Design a protein with these regions (language model features):
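C-terminal, loop-rich substrate-recognition/catalytic regions characterized by aromatic stacking residues
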Residues: 32-34, 240-282, 377-661
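Short glycine-enriched nucleophile-adjacent loop
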Residues: 175-186
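Accessory cap/linker subdomain of secreted extracellular hydrolases
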Residues: 32-35, 48, 110-111, 119, ...
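Cap/lid segment of the alpha/beta-hydrolase catalytic domain
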Residues: 81-157, 204-207, 211-213, 372-383, ...
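Active-site-adjacent alpha-helix of alpha/beta-hydrolase-fold enzymes
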Residues: 338-359
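Alpha/beta-hydrolase fold nucleophile elbow
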Residues: 160-173
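Short beta-strand/loop motif that positions the catalytic acidic residue
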Residues: 328-330
Length: 661
């Protein structure tokens, strides 16, 4: 239960209703609860970490840092007490709750990261993004990080204890803002470490995901759930004239975490029109479906992949040069590994020679931001990918030693430019480049007798195109889409299970086409981009096509490796007007490349499944040719995949030649 709030009044701030809370004068009694042994152990551990931190650090909490527009961002600063000189800064900026006090538990939060940084001679600065917790202003996802990020770095480097060098680190929303700010080339920002950072990548090469909002032009539905909790234009805020002591006291009294009721997303994602999903779960008004007084204007669901609004906020695009050393962490089952790899390669190709040589990447076989949760038997979904552990913390501190302190770092010196995990074989491999050095491509062509439907059909992947066209046909009904089973993703509650699962139970559906290769005669490493080209037809004006790639074991189990989708209206490009389909015509569509790494042992097969939906990982195309997001009814599409000499539908994958694993 939250403490009672007295003298509540309402104020208007930036055109948005906010509640200003006057602080109670006296202490607030915590609710009496019986602690479990686990909670008692946690409290004891955290208290010990806090004591250690206070013994070696100058602790300066709830420092309000003024931005150029006068709004103040809340920061907690930890720096070594007995430093012999000025120190470098590790900067963590986040929309999430870093408050030092766990109000519910009545104890400090886990300060082990801050303690580790101070022990190694760093200042460590936590800062909340604009419009979150104790930070002032109006929140917009990646809306104003360019100016706020630059101003924060300038503030840090101007402090008397600073050596003038700042390095950024963090995962997910704590990473996404970094790239666009790095591209501002702010003096003092010496290096960056981005982890699971796809929502910060706007446009890069063929990818127009605009911060993970799209894939192939289809909406990635993860942000509906995420924004339900995070778009907090109506929230409790404190008066602007409070002292630092007042704010510290308040931070031990008030838990400012948004705690909305958890909706039944299994039902909510089905709501039509799509723009009303937030309303259907009684979510707050905000940037998802409402026009807002923010730099990009809000109303994200109504945009298209090349809408001007995407270029007014804090996304990084490939015309923004990055010329700072970078340490990049990615994972095979994250939301967007391929745009992230494309961003890494783009920086290596466009930075100055010295900086291009200072870009390092690690690609792990884990879910979103789960790097340090790898174990001796790392299980992703139902697939055991073996011992995927790695000393990420050691590498990050070694990286900062090199680029913030200017000292030798043996761990960095021995680190390969690209380190990637090969699933199946379950081993780390390294390469000077991505795709791996020496990689070649192999093509397999789709064929069938016209009955590739289901796991039990006659679809095959063969070495040469040809034969008579017997197109494989299926019905795509938006009211009965293929539901998501595994894959890469994030943040959709219990509605979607991400990772790798045996796909066979789902492949009995008649609206899924299945194509199998012959068993591999020898072990084969497939590491790099996979590109699929299909020749398709439909009686709908617009529809989607999807594919999923699997490793089929000798016992018949088929574990998914990667997947993709393409909205047909964007098949000629996201920066071009939409193009529509005509009944009876066959169209070539090439999906954006999607990356993975897997070792196919002898006797295993490569399987590709084709359909027109993967919901609710991606939104449903209602097949009408309309806006989709504001439509309440769809139509059934009669879709087909063609494969003959004139229509060489194929999958192209990347093979790394080598001997036995």
């Amino acid at each position: 239960m939250r403490p009672a709030l007295h003298h509540v009044r309402t104020a208007l701030s930036v055109g948005v209703a906010s509640v200003c809370l006057a602080l109670v004068a006296g202490p607030v009694a915590a609710q009496q609860t019986v602690l479990t042994p686990e909670q008692k152990a946690t409290i004891a551990k955290r208290n010990d970490i806090e004591r250690q931190l206070e013994a070696i650090a100058v602790v300066d909490r709830k420092v309000m840092v003024k931005m150029r527009d006068g709004k103040r961002m809340a920061a907690d600063v930890y720096r070594p007490k007995d430093a012999s000189g000025k120190v470098p800064t590790i900067f963590v900026r986040t929309p999430y709750n870093f408050n030092f006090w766990d109000v519910k538990l009545g104890a400090p939060r886990d300060m082990s990261r801050q303690l580790a940084a101070v022990k190694r001679g760093y200042a460590y600065v936590d800062m909340n993004e604009r419009g979150h917790y104790f930070s002032e202003g109006n929140y917009e996802i990646l809306g104003a990080p360019l100016s706020d990020g630059v101003d924060a770095i300038r503030w840090m480097t101007s402090q008397p204890w600073s050596n003038g060098k700042v390095g950024t680190t963090g995962c997910s929303s704590t990473a996404e803002w970094q790239m666009a700010v790095v591209a501002q080339n702010t003096p003092g920002l010496a290096t960056f470490n981005v982890q699971g950072f796809g929502a910060g990548v706007g446009r890069v090469g063929p990818y127009y995901e605009q911060g993970n909002w799209y894939r192939g032009g289809a909406v990635q539905m993860l942000f509906i759930d995420w924004l339900y909790k995070e778009q907090n234009q109506v929230r409790p805020v404190f008066p602007a004239n409070l002292s630092q002591a007042d704010l510290i006291r308040a931070s031990k009294m008030f838990d400012l975490d948004s705690q909305p009721p958890e909706p039944d997303w299994d039902k909510a994602f089905w709501v039509l029109p799509e723009k009303d999903i937030m309303k259907s779960v009684d979510g707050p008004k905000g940037i998802f479906a409402d026009a807002m007084d923010v730099p990009t204007g809000g109303n994200m669901i109504a945009r298209t992949p090349n809408s001007p609004a995407w270029y007014k906020g804090g996304l990084w695009h490939d015309d923004m040069k990055i010329d700072k050393p970078g340490l990049w962490f990615m994972s095979w089952f994250d939301v967007s590994v391929s745009p992230n790899l494309a961003a890494y390669n783009h920086v290596r190709a466009t930075a100055s020679k010295e900086i291009a040589d200072q870009q390092y990447a690690i690609i792990a076989p884990v879910l979103h931001c789960a790097y340090t949760r790898a174990t001796e038997h790392t299980v992703i979904g139902d697939l055991d990918v073996g011992d995927a552990r790695f000393d990420y913390e050691g590498l990050v501190f070694g990286w900062f030693d090199k680029f913030l302190k200017g000292v030798d770092s043996p761990i960095v010196d021995k680190q390969p430019k690209v380190m990637y995990y090969v699933m199946g074989e379950n081993k780390w491999r390294d390469s000077p480049t991505w795709p791996p050095a020496g990689a070649t491509t192999r093509e397999l062509f789709l064929t069938s007798g016209g009955k590739a439907n289901t796991l039990y059909g006659d679809g095959k992947l063969v070495d040469a195109a040809g034969g008579t066209d017997h197109p494989d046909q299926f019905l795509y009904d938006p009211a009965n889409p293929v539901t998501t089973l595994g894959g890469g993703g994030c943040c959709q509650g219990t509605a979607v299970k991400f990772g790798s699962f045996d796909q066979n139970p789902q492949l009995a559906r008649n609206d899924i086409l299945v194509y199998d290769s012959e068993p591999f005669k020898e072990g084969t490493e497939v590491s790099g981009p996979i590109t699929v080209t299909l020749y398709v037809s439909s009686d709908a004006k617009d529809t989607d096509f999807t594919f999923k790639v699997m490793d089929v074991y000798p016992d018949g189990r088929a574990f998914n490796l990667t997947e993709n989708i393409q909205r047909m209206r964007y098949r000629e490009g996201y920066d071009k007007p939409p193009v529509w389909m005509k009944d009876g015509e066959v169209y070539k569509v090439t999906f954006q490349p999607i990356d993975t790494s897997n070792f196919f042992f002898a006797g295993h097969k490569l399987r590709m499944a084709v359909s027109s939906s993967n919901f609710p990982r991606f939104d449903r195309n209602l097949n009408t040719g309309g806006n989709n997001y504001d439509e309440a009814k769809g139509v059934i599409a009669h879709n087909a995949v063609h494969h003959d000499a004139a229509h060489p539908s194929k999958i192209t994958f990347t093979v790394v030649p080598r001997g036995k694993p």
